[in-house]
Amino acid sequence: MLKVGFYLRELNFRGIANSIYIYAKNNQTILKNKSIIFYNSTALDNRPEAITEFKKKFKTIKISNLNELERINKNLKLDYIYFQRDGSKDEIVNNSKNIIHAVFPQNIFQYHGSNYAFISKWLSKTCSNNKFAFAPLPVQLLKNNQNLRAKLKIPKNAKVFGYHGGETSFDLVFVRDVIKKVVKQNENVYFLFMNIGKFFNHKRVIFTKGTFNQTQKVKFINSCDAMLHARSLGESFGLSCAEFAIKNKPIFTYGFCRQRAHFEICKNNIIPYYSYEDLNLKILSFNKDRKYNSNNLKKELSEKNTIKIFKKIL
């Protein structure tokens, strides 16, 4: 049995924390290893609810820096310490093997640690011409068909466009402007956000708090007919996009973004838009009854498949 430490620079509702939680769980339940969580107690974006969920499942240790982790490891004797971070050369823990899982584009000179891998095939291809491995992130969605429409007073026949992600990640201004126009044009269209800073006050533009609760997350996604993605940078993986796609939802996303992993991962569900006018037209003409099938993606990003690939980067 291996002892694997998982380090989080911040412990919150975002994709890194979610994917590390699933990796750490499956490292124990499937690979039969030991998972120990370390998180930076000084991070301003830590969320108590997320910390509580980790503590329920794992030994969870707060630290203020990696030197402290190194001191603790003199007794723990971890076999590996896993970092999911931007991928540029950074601090490591010298008395353990370090696994670096890079989430952003990096050139090959940023390679460091014992093993180095990207989180998507797109990153590996773009940054290393496929020379470096990639290990896709796991997607965990509970088998639950319930939704939040009744609770949020959204009619069953309404068209609902939703998004969840980092608080500032819905940052394309022209998309926000389209939303403001659409709610005036069509009373049957709703917009639903989770963990996004409120940018408009309207009864059909609904903002809900972020959560680490997987049941609430899947109910949120079930409430939507489509995802409206508006992150100007794009995605180096796109965990929230994959979550919507696996629930057979189409994904409206900006066609000119730089990081395009979600175009490859969710290719059968992507509806690109290119301008204010284009998005406005596509939202108004959207057919919510069209069926999407993501069975192949479900298998590719399943917990069993992704933990097998994770094992290869140890």
Put a short name on every predicted segment.
Residues 250-255:
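Short hydrophobic beta-strand element within catalytic cores of glycosyltransferases
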Residues 15, 277, 287-314:
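A charged, aromatic-enriched C-terminal amphipathic alpha-helix characteristic of glycosyltransferases
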Residues 8-14, 21-68, 197:
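N-terminal strand-loop element at the rim of the active site
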Residues 78, 219-236, 249:
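Acidic donor-binding loop of glycosyltransferase active sites
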Residues 218, 241-246, 260-261:
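Short alpha-helical segment that forms part of, or immediately flanks, the ligand-binding pocket
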Residues 63-69, 197, 205-221:
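Conserved active-site histidine-acidic residue motif and adjacent donor-binding/catalytic loop
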Residues 137-201, 207:
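Conserved catalytic-core segment of nucleotide-activated headgroup transferases in glycan assembly
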Residues 114-145:
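Donor nucleotide-sugar binding/catalytic pocket of nucleotide-sugar-dependent glycosyltransferases
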